[in-house]
Amino acid sequence: MIKTFSIVALLITLFNFGSFAEEIQAFNFTKEEFDNLTVRKIKKKTKYTLGSNENGNFLKAEAEGQASGLGKEILINLNKTPFLNITWKVEKDLFGIDEKSKKGHDYAARVFVIKKTGSTALSNRAINYVFSSNEEIGQYWRSPFTKKSIDYVLATTKTNNNEWVTVKTNVKKDFKKLHDLDVDELNGVAIMTDTDNSKIKSIAYYQNIYFSSE
């Protein structure tokens, strides 16, 4: 499927970068928060629904040929809270696609962190932390749609299929490693499940996404 704009570019434009949000919890997955998240879609919206279990609230994402993300403007001090923590699960993955190509650039689950680096939204830099269906943990590559975003595998269904897994990464160090940037603050965060290229059905869950000092 040919895209006029990349998914990454559309997600980056979610943010106006105005107010300071003094919090380290990225998403609470409450109804109030859900109703106020900014939505950007490529063609058809991914189905997002709220739920809860013994560990708290979660967001369920279902896509079959759809692609839309949920994002918010949030200022994170990476000198104080550089670690991003994500608890997530992929119930139905996208086995067999080439995630590094334009035709296969779909992910069952992904979390974007965004840094404003220029005068326009499309000049911003992003790291796209992904729950891969085919690649190994620790692998990374530039998005086939924009050099401003790098995909970085934090989890894979090759080792964690249909089970909750919690991952942690140092975002400040990741920006230096992947973009060669010394970043003190983040400006936005977004989540997305998309299958608009592969048209395969995917189901994933997001829970307890937050930044921490250690």
Where are these regions (language model features)?
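Sec-dependent N-terminal signal peptides
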Residues: 5-15
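Extracellular carbohydrate-recognition regions
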Residues: 21-42
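Extracellular beta-strand elements of beta-rich domains used
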Residues: 29, 189, 207-211
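Extracellular/lumenal carbohydrate-interaction signature centered on repeated Trp-anchored short motifs
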Residues: 73-84, 158-161, 182
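Extracellular beta-strand ligand-recognition surfaces/modules
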Residues: 106-111, 147-148, 153-157, 161-201
